[in-house]
Amino acid sequence: KLGSLLSYIKTNTSKNGTSVTGVDPTTLGVSTRTDGTTRAFTETILKDVIAKVFASGGTPSALFVSPTQKQVVSGFTGLAAQRYQVPTSGQATILSGADLYQSDFGVLQIVPNRFQRSRDALVLDPEYAALAYLRPFQTNDIAKVGDADKKQILAELTLEVRNEAAHGGAFDLS
C-alpha cells in the first residue's frame, strides 16, 4: 500500500474531535484522518502522545513540527531555562529555542519541517520507518546536443512504515 505518513498514524494520537470531526484513518495506508477543531499545543498533549507510543512498543526519538509549532515547543514551561556565563570580553548569547526534548521515555530531537502542516506534530521512531525502492536508481541516456551527452537519473521511492504503533501524532493544533 502506498500512502502518506498521516494515513499510517492511527493508534497513538491526540486529537480534538467527535465521531464526525478529528477522526483517525480507518484503513491504514489508504484513508487519511479528518481534521477536527484546532486547539492550543501544550506539553500535556505532547507527553500523552509520547507515553502512548512508548506503551505500544516504540522508542520515539524525533518530533517533527512546523516552524510555528517549533516556537510553541520551545516555549513549554517544562523546558529548563538555558543560560551561558558570558565572558567579560565576549558577546552575550540569548537562547530561546529548544532542539531536544527530554521526556520520561527518552530524548526526542525537535525537527522543524517547513513542508508540514502547522496543525500536526509527529512523534516518530525512525527505526520503524524507511525508504522503500519501487524502482532502484538507474541512469538513462536521453539526448545528445552537440558534444554534450545528457543523462537522466531515475528512481521511484516511497515511505515504508514498518510498525504503525511505533509512531504517534498530536493533531488539530492551532
Q: Where do the language-model regions lie?
A:
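Sequence/fold signature of self-assembling virion shell proteins
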Residues: K1-D48, G58-T59, K70-S174
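A short acidic-Thr-Gly-centered motif at the start of a beta-strand
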Residues: V53-S56
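Hydrophobic beta-strand segments of well-ordered beta-sheets in folded domains
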Residues: P60-V65
